[in-house]
Amino acid sequence: MAKKKIGKIVFLIVICLFLAVQLYPVLWLFLASIKPTTELSAAPFALPKSPTLANYIKIFSDGKILGYMWNSFKITAVSIVLIVFLSATAGFAISKFRFKLTGRIYAFFTFGIMIPVQITLIPLFIFYSRMHILNTSFSLILPQVGFALPLSVMLFVSFYSFIPNELIESAIVDGCSPYRTFISIVFPLAKNTVITVASMHSIFIWNDFIFANTFISEQAAKTVALGLKDYVGAFGNVDWGATYAAIAV
């Protein structure tokens, strides 16, 4: 019993230390965002002596941050819906409907994981420029969905492999079409995979900088990650208070 108690205590200590390490940057970010600029420069790691909301008032006064947040939300929401729909349906077809090219199609998606994002930037920029879709939400949604599909399809195929084929066959025998079988039976069972795919890619898409920095130059189309560059001055001077407040929001 004593060994079990000691083990539990050690486990709790480790968990508390882990939480402290994870939460400290968030706490520090909030404290830094409510410090005056002079105090933040003089003592960045000290507790705020005269907390102020001036940094938050500053970022909301020009209205830019709200536009950035709306653009990021719009792009993230549309991308996640497309990713979940396309990967769930493709995974179902690959897993449960065997045909001649099933293996090659699955290998094609698997190969997509190995393609670096960076090598596609110039070709996509040229393509978008010719199609006149630079500085649009579509220019960010398309690559986000494309690069998210390989891993998402693999996750859905892995889950569908645990669903008995007899369940699908019995539904078809009872008169369900493949579409009805997927919508009414298979997809509801995959809610855990849906949550995993949606939460994982929503973080990546919301924080995306490389695509936004390449394809977006107009102020009205900027996302949150790209809009934070606005707080960097012409000579590299950074308004850290406003930047931290924007990140906290």
Residue ranges with predicted function:
Residues 3-249:
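A structural signal for multi-pass alpha-helical bundles of membrane permease subunits
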